[in-house]
């Protein structure tokens, strides 16, 4: 069974498994910026509900507001109106410290560019979120090593980012996002800087990790073939999210 057939089977099993708890939800989210003295509405009454273990793709034209949506979903930016809840807790009802603690505990982030610290090894880059939580160096490295094994890079733990390929660096970034065992990972064009075959491998890895770790993924991508491998697709057009029908791959 090839990767895509396997993914399609697992997606169908997931969809047939009934409703699961909602880990991330946006209700009536609107985001407006002021540009050149004019109000520009990027998000218009956006509604998003992400279930545990679900893979949700967000697609849309360049400049349509996909990254803005991820920032709002991740509590990195506040909506002009509406509400975002993480594990049932609305960000707007939390003090800044509580919001940061919840975000750091329950969310992981992956970007188009890996943002690894060049002076640290792959192992210590992955361990960094745990060290920020004041976990001991020894324990943090143990968890980081286990996660590197899961992304197939156990043998590269002592290498620095400059000694890794583009695909390997992105796999380290994925391991870093998952090492805290978040409920949901927000990924902004995670394969956009990779060649076709490497992008395909990295995307498959994310979907497989979502299944094995029961972690939700919200993935912004411009690639319709990759988006079709997720459980659901939402298209952002003129600030409004539209759900698209699943198309077998």
From Swiss-Prot:
It holds the Pfam family ABC_tran. The keyword Transport applies. One of its GO terms (cellular component) is plasma membrane. Its EC number is 7.6.2.-. GO terms for biological process: lipoprotein localization to outer membrane; protein localization to outer membrane. ATP binds at residues 60-67. One of its GO terms (molecular function) is transmembrane transporter activity. The keyword Transferase does not apply. It is found in: Cell inner membrane. It is a peripheral membrane protein. Keywords: ATP-binding, Cell inner membrane, Cell membrane, Membrane, Nucleotide-binding, Translocase, Transport. InterPro entries: AAA+_ATPase, ABC_transporter-like_ATP-bd, ABC_transporter-like_CS, ABC_transpr_LolD-like, LolD_lipo_ATP-bd, MacB-like_ATP-bd, P-loop_NTPase. Its main location: membrane. It is an enzyme of class 7 (translocase). Residues 24-249 form the ABC transporter domain. The complex is composed of two ATP-binding proteins (LolD) and two transmembrane proteins (LolC and LolE). Belongs to the ABC transporter superfamily. Lipoprotein translocase (TC 3.A.1.125) family. Part of the ABC transporter complex LolCDE involved in the translocation of mature outer membrane-directed lipoproteins, from the inner membrane to the periplasmic chaperone, LolA. Responsible for the formation of the LolA-lipoprotein complex in an ATP-dependent manner. This is Lipoprotein-releasing system ATP-binding protein LolD. It comes from Burkholderia mallei (strain ATCC 23344). The lineage of its organism: Bacteria, Pseudomonadati, Pseudomonadota, Betaproteobacteria, Burkholderiales.
């Amino acid at each position: 069974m090839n990767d895509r057939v396997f993914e399609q089977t697992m997606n169908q099993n997931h969809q047939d498994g009934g409703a699961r708890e909602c880990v991330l939800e946006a209700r009536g989210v609107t985001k407006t910026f002021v540009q050149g003295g004019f109000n520009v509405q990027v998000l218009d009454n956006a509604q998003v509900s992400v279930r545990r273990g679900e893979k949700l793709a967000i697609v849309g034209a360049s400049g349509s507001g996909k990254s803005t949506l991820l920032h709002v979903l991740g509590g990195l930016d506040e909506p002009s109106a509406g509400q975002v809840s993480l594990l049932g807790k609305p960000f707007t009802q939390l003090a800044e410290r509580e919001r940061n603690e919840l975000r750091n505990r329950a969310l992981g982030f992956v970007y188009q560019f890996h943002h690894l610290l060049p002076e640290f090894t792959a192992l210590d880059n992955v361990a960094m979120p745990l060290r920020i939580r004041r976990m001991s160096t020894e324990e943090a490295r143990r968890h980081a090593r286990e996660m590197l094994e899961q992304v197939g890079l156990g043998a590269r733990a002592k290498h620095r980012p400059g000694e890794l390929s583009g695909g390997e660096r992105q796999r380290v970034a994925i391991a870093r996002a998952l090492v805290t065992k978040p409920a949901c990972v927000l990924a902004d064009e995670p394969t956009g800087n990779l060649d076709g075959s490497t992008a395909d491998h990295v995307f498959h890895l994310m979907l497989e990790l979502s299944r094995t770790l029961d972690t939700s993924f919200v993935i912004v991508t411009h690639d319709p073939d990759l988006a079709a491998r997720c459980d659901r697709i939402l298209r952002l057009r003129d600030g409004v999210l539209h759900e698209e029908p699943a198309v077998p791959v």
